[in-house]
Amino acid sequence: MRECRNNMFIQLGLICIFAFNVVCGNPIAKTLNGTLYGTTMSTRLGRSIYAFLGIPYAAPPLQKLRFKPPQSPIAWNGTLHATANAEICMQRNIYVDQKEIVGSEDCLYLNVYTPCIQCTEEQSNLNHDPEQQRQKAFARFPVMIWFHGGGWLAGAGHSEYYGPKFLLDFDLVLVTVNFRLGPLGFMSTEDLECPGNLGLKDQQQAMRWVHENIAYFGGDSNRVTLFGESAGGASVHYHMVNPLSAGLFHRGISQSGNFYNPWTLTSPGIARMRAMTLGKHLGCSTENSKDLIECLQMKSAEEIIGTDQLFKKFGYCPMIPFRPVIEPEHPGAFLIEDPLISVREGRLLDVPWMTGVTSEEGAIKVAGIYGREQNVKELETNFDKIVPMSLLYDERYNVTNEDLRNEITATIRNFYFGYNVIDYNEYSRFKVVDMYSDSWFNHGTHEAVQDFIVNQTSPVFYYYFAYKGSISFSTIFGDPVRDYGVSHADDLQYLFPVGEQLFPNTTLSEEDHKMIDIMTYIWYNFANSGNPTPKVTKVVPLKWKPVKTSSAPEYLRIENSKKITMDHSLLWQRMIFWDSLTHRLMNHGNTFRHLKDEL
């Protein structure tokens, strides 16, 4: 396979050599806003590719532009050196217990990686000859836009973590995006002063930039795939219900995150309450939204990000204090109704979708619980108080009936633990993992897939990633000692070289490299054609079938390079259990997600 790939590189080089505009080994690209001077990088298999880093896709959101929608980028004269990553958006990563606040408010930049650029105006702009248009479009590469995870409060599109080393062994253009995070990106007063969803609007602005400029990098603006993990995966899903995103992308991949998950949407009233809590802590008037926003625009970004400690009750729970929110209707609004209503009333964009989970998603939380002995004791002792808040059903379904809350909580305890105490033994640990996995990730994905096949004509491809590699993200989520299985985010290691930064002392095994071959092959093919397995190969020796039946959804199970199989009814008994809980909560809670009976 590698010999064939090397031959492909040689052929591609011969095709593209006449299209490059290279100065002293560095590529030049002309965009609508100005000329870029890029750099070169090498892929895992030794391919030389072109990188343009720190490209502005919006004006810096500073001063009066803080808490405002992104504005068009400012054009520049001369040549902009796009050879280094821009600053990351200001943040503090509570998931790894980061102490310092890092980054900058001037952060709306993206990176573009390409195997071949079309550098001149003549090469980038199609003429009016239909045959030449067809040939040039065919020669362009599919585009993949990456939205990072991190709970909409941490992360970045930087090359050190989400670089092209693995994916650019295939013929595609990769775009990675920074967007505003935490209260700077997701605070909302639930009115027109600060309606919210700024981070999602940043993403949409980046998508517009790609649509207008990606041809200059050899990309096909009519073959764009959004993909993301965790909050990035949920972001992709949100763009699928936004009519302003229509036409800017053509396929979506949501890894370990979609808007059915309970941490992805703020209940009415709560977003405003948190905005007021933040403002009051910083000495701002909370009499009205206008005064609050004007006051917060005068505060430092560090002060605003530093309020994250105000909202923590059990570790970093409740999960993600500043999230997407339903906005009042106005021009440019990103979300004006519960996205579940959008899906069930036919307003989800009908594009191919790929989604799935890792086998132990809940390790993202449970490693932090078991990494500190007092947390395990607290969970056992105060289960009735912690679980409704931490699993988010108290907020999501606005449970005001104490008897109902206690009944649901007791049902959860009995299902996962029976009469056993929650302690340090392995059985207990993995049951806590299952509980968080199902509540935060698995059940929402199960519901999303079922609704998709009922309401859409495009295919949905469902997967279960159960490959245990050389190292796990659980080691940085709070416990470097114990085993938690295949953690949330573990799949990232086989699409991007994140491990080189996060786990520098771990060398990828031969099996890890085979998993990179598998994952990049599947992701590339989906981006290229909408079919993740167009043919049976040695790398993936079967066809991945889309989901056809809601009563027993088909899915691809990835365990190792020799065990990739089709199966159905993923975690079925656990999903039936959560179906019953959700039904009870929606029937008896005061939920804003209390949808029509027929839904």
Task: Name every feature range the model reports, one short phrase each.
Residues 1-17:
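Classical eukaryotic N-terminal signal peptides for Sec-dependent ER targeting/secretion
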Residues 2-3, 19-200, 221, 362, ...:
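Non-catalytic accessory segments of hydrolases
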Residues 47-57, 62-74, 367-386, 542-546:
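Short Gly/aromatic-enriched secondary-structure transition segments
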Residues 52, 105-109, 142, 350-351, ...:
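Extracellular structured ligand-interaction cores
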Residues 97-289, 293, 298, 342-369:
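Serine-hydrolase-like catalytic core of hydrolytic proteins
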Residues 287-289, 304-307, 458-463, 529-540:
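Acidic/polar loop patches that form or flank catalytic/metal-binding clefts of enzymes
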Residues 295-513, 597:
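Substrate-gating cap/lid region and adjacent catalytic-acid/histidine neighborhood
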